[in-house]
From Swiss-Prot:
It comes from Cauliflower mosaic virus (strain W260). Gene3D superfamilies: Ribonuclease H1, N-terminal domain. The lineage of its organism: Viruses, Riboviria, Pararnavirae, Artverviricota, Revtraviricetes. Keywords: Host cytoplasm, Translation regulation. This is Transactivator/viroplasmin protein. Enhances the ribosomal termination-reinitiation event leading to the translation of major open reading frames on the polycistronic viral RNAs. Its main location: host cell. It is found in: Host cytoplasm. Residues 487-520 are annotated as: Disordered. The keyword Transmembrane helix does not apply. Belongs to the caulimoviridae viroplasmin family. GO terms for biological process: regulation of translation. InterPro entries: Ribosomal_bL9/RNase_H1_N, RNase_H1_N, RNase_H1_N_sf. GO terms for cellular component: host cell cytoplasm. Pfam families: Cauli_VI.
Length: 520
């Protein structure tokens, strides 16, 4: 814009000079003195040609003086400079926004004032902060350890370097000097190599070529295999959190063999509890939620130590997960404390037609102290299909024994009770009558010879021994009549308001720890 205005101003000046030259030519022609040549150019105020003619018409003989004697021919004419049309005798003409005076032509830039640039409109970089423009502040992030340790200037690269990697420490700094000092202090104390600065465009968190991928160290958990469907991107709806598709016998045998042969190498998110016949999973923080769900469906979990966000149990049944959330929110003062889920479960039972019995669980929730995991040992796995029934009876006996131990505990709070699951926690107060009735109802529903989905004489015999130790009596009409038969799946899922007609009856006498009750 400034260049255009300057050119327009120069155009006006040239037009004024052109008008002045034309006026002088007209004046010379009127006086007949064209032979005297061009007159010297003076910086005079421009006038119109009509004004020149009108000025000449006002001349009188008295106003004209005699010309002195000339030494050269052709100089007898009147000197045009003595006429009355000199600039001082002319009326100024307004030709622009301002009147132009002769002195302006002697000034720099023809007298045109050059406006000073304002500071706000300046494009000089140091003045940007004064005009309100804020420069972006770059933070620096130090990833102290892990496979991608270094100093980053981008949070996206830092998150990719630390996300999903357990035990990685990182911190944000305002300047590169502070970040470098913190990184050097850490590497010096740990006696490790100096951390490199990794700009945003040079961060290589994944191999760029197939050759680099082959030379990269394999992931520690690459050998694990999950049996379920593809992991959903978000928590499934309550109706989707179930064991459908139902766990098959092949799935159970795979998990059973996996936990028996696990020796603790390659995965620090779990350890095992090994017995002579069976090994059970113990899941720690950052365990695979899909693996936890499948082991829960197989009845092969002893303990779960979840993170504060409970991500490890997010695929368990919704009511179980909600009960754990309520315990963390309502039952403990410090919600940041670690908790545990101690599970006693039966295992599935199959027939030729398919799944006959789904596991039943008794789960205790509590605050976890310092965890000292046991050493996992690789155990021999020689289980056959015909051995599954014997294993199911063994886990069923342990389940009944754990359930009956609740009668000896005087301070219990029932967190959730369902048809096949009971969740409880320790309480500082005595067990209320409502919780006591819930425990007794659950015992009556599950403690019977049909615990595993079919009538099992071995289970009945075990119940007789347990009840007789407590001074009670037990009767099973199927055992008395010699009708130990295998029931179908419908016998295990009878109506909730009453036991199925094939249930046996357990009668107990009054004892100091329990009231007289009927268990079917």
């Amino acid at each position: 814009m400034e260049n255009i205005e300057k050119l327009l101003m120069q155009e006006k000046i040239l037009m004024l000079e052109l008008d002045l030259v034309r006026a002088k030519i007209s004046l010379a022609r009127a006086n007949g003195s064209s032979q005297q040549g061009d007159l010297p150019l003076h910086r005079e105020t421009p006038v119109k040609e009509e004004a020149v003619h009108s000025a000449l018409a006002t001349f009188t003989p008295s106003q004209v003086k005699a010309i002195p004697e000339q030494t050269a021919p052709g100089k007898e004419s009147t000197n045009p400079l003595m006429a009355s049309i000199l600039p001082k005798d002319m009326n100024p003409v307004q030709t622009g926004m301002r009147l132009t005076v002769p002195g302006d032509f002697l000034r720099p830039h023809q007298g045109i004032p050059i406006p000073r640039k304002s500071e706000l409109s300046s494009t000089v970089a140091p003045l940007r902060a004064e005009s309100g423009i804020q420069h972006p502040h770059i933070n620096y992030y130090v990833v102290y350890n892990g496979p991608h340790a270094g100093i980053y200037d981008d949070w996206g690269c830092t998150k990719a370097a630390t996300n999903g990697v357990p035990g990685v420490a990182h911190k944000k700094f305002a300047t590169i000097t502070e970040a470098r000092a913190a990184a050097d202090a850490y590497t010096t104390s740990q006696q490790t190599d100096r951390l490199n600065f990794i700009p945003k465009g040079e961060a290589q968190l994944k191999p760029k070529s197939f050759a680099k991928a082959l030379t990269s160290p394999p992931k520690q958990k690459a050998h694990w295999l999950t049996l379920g469907t593809k992991k959903p991107s978000s928590d499934p709806a309550p109706k989707e959190i179930s064991f459908d598709p139902e766990i098959t016998m092949d799935d159970f045998l795979y998990l059973y063999d996996l936990v028996r042969k696990f020796d603790g190498e390659g995965d620090d998110t779990m350890f095992t509890t090994d017995n002579e016949k069976i090994s059970l999973f113990n899941f720690r923080k950052n365990a695979n939620p899909q693996m936890v769900r499948e082991a829960y469906a197989a009845g092969l979990i002893k303990t779960i130590y979840p993170s504060n966000n409970l991500q490890e149990i997010k695929y368990l049944p919704k009511k179980v997960k909600d009960a754990v959330k309520r315990f963390r929110t309502n039952c403990i003062k410090n919600t940041e404390k670690d908790i545990f889920l101690k599970i006693r479960s039966t295992i599935p039972v199959w027939t030729i037609q398919g799944l006959l019995h789904k596991p039943r669980q008794v789960i205790e929730i509590g605050v976890s102290k310092k965890l000292v995991p046991t050493e996992s040992k690789a155990m021999e796995s020689k289980i056959q299909i015909e051995d599954l029934t014997e294993l199911a009876v063994k886990t069923g006996e342990q389940f009944i024994q754990s359930l009956l131990r609740l009668n000896d505990k005087k301070k219990i709070f029932v967190n959730m009770v369902e048809h096949d699951t009971l969740i409880y926690s320790k309480n500082i107060k005595e067990t209320v009558s409502e919780d006591q009735r819930a425990i007794e109802t659950f015992q009556q529903r599950v403690i019977s010879g049909n615990l595993l989905g079919f009538h099992c004489p071995a289970i009945c015999h075990f119940i007789v021994k347990i009840v007789e130790k407590e001074g009670g009596t037990y009767q099973c009409h199927h055992c008395d009549k010699g009708k130990a038969i295998v029931k179908d799946a419908s016998a295990d899922s009878g109506p909730k308001d009453g036991p199925p007609p094939t249930r046996s009856i357990v009668e107990k006498e009054d004892v100091p720890t329990t009231s007289s009750k009927q268990v079917d």
